[in-house]
Amino acid sequence: MARYTGPVTRKSRRLGTDLVGGDQSFEKRPYPPGQHGRARIKDSEYRQQLQEKQKARFTYGVMEKQFRRYYEEAVRHSGKTGEELLKILESRLDNVVYRAGLARTRRMARQLVSHGHFSVNGVHVNVPSYRVSQYDIIDVRDNSLNTVPFQIARETAGDRPIPSWLQVVGERQRILIHQLPERAQIEVPLTEQLIVEYYSK
């Protein structure tokens, strides 16, 4: 599947938000790249909606076609469409690995999943977009536990708060999904209603 692999800091500056988390280069220059980056650009309603959609896509590392499918699924749910969309994005396995503190960024989490380091409910899973469910159990595979990424994760455990809807247990770094997150539990700088308005046109 196609994936954006370009400079993430440049994309962060274009969209006005840190897509990585702790990106020092973005913090130094949080304005769009290029010679006119500091110039004020009048935001139209459409531009704001498009930018919010792009922020969500690049935050979670999802291509447009798949993101549109997530939106269409969210529309079919009984809750608020924007909130349901965020719940879907948060339930991706790569995001769960990131939220649990086993990877510094979502991009790194995606690589760890793709390289086959995890099982879900005892079944080997290497698809970053795999969707977890309530009561799922995610384990680091035995032959991966002592590799560098997971050693670092153990050493830095507690550096980043873990959301209350999941739990990391013991030295084996088992992840327990207590529930799927509610909107108040999702800390991400997005205004999801703008995304709904973008696709509702």
Curated annotation (Swiss-Prot):
UniProt GO molecular function: rRNA binding; structural constituent of ribosome
CDD domains on file: S4 (cd00165)
Entry's Gene Ontology cellular component terms: small ribosomal subunit
Superkingdom, natural source: Bacteria
Record-annotated S4 RNA-binding domain positions: 91-157
SMART domains hit by this protein: Ribosomal_S4 (SM01390), S4 (SM00363)
Annotated stretches, region: Disordered: 1-42
Pfam family, one: S4
InterPro entries hit by this protein: Ribosomal_uS4, Ribosomal_uS4_bac-type, Ribosomal_uS4_CS, Ribosomal_uS4_N, S4_RNA-bd, S4_RNA-bd_sf
tRNA processing keyword on record: no
Entry keywords, A to Z: Ribonucleoprotein, Ribosomal protein, RNA-binding, rRNA-binding
GO terms of biological process kind: ribosomal small subunit biogenesis; translation
The protein's role, per its UniProt record: One of the primary rRNA binding proteins, it binds directly to 16S rRNA where it nucleates assembly of the body of the 30S subunit. With S5 and S12 plays an important role in translational accuracy.
Family the UniProt entry places it in: Belongs to the universal ribosomal protein uS4 family.
Subunit-level organization: Part of the 30S ribosomal subunit. Contacts protein S5. The interaction surface between S4 and S5 is involved in control of translational fidelity.
Official protein name in the record: Small ribosomal subunit protein uS4
Organism the protein comes from: Mycobacterium marinum (strain ATCC BAA-535 / M)
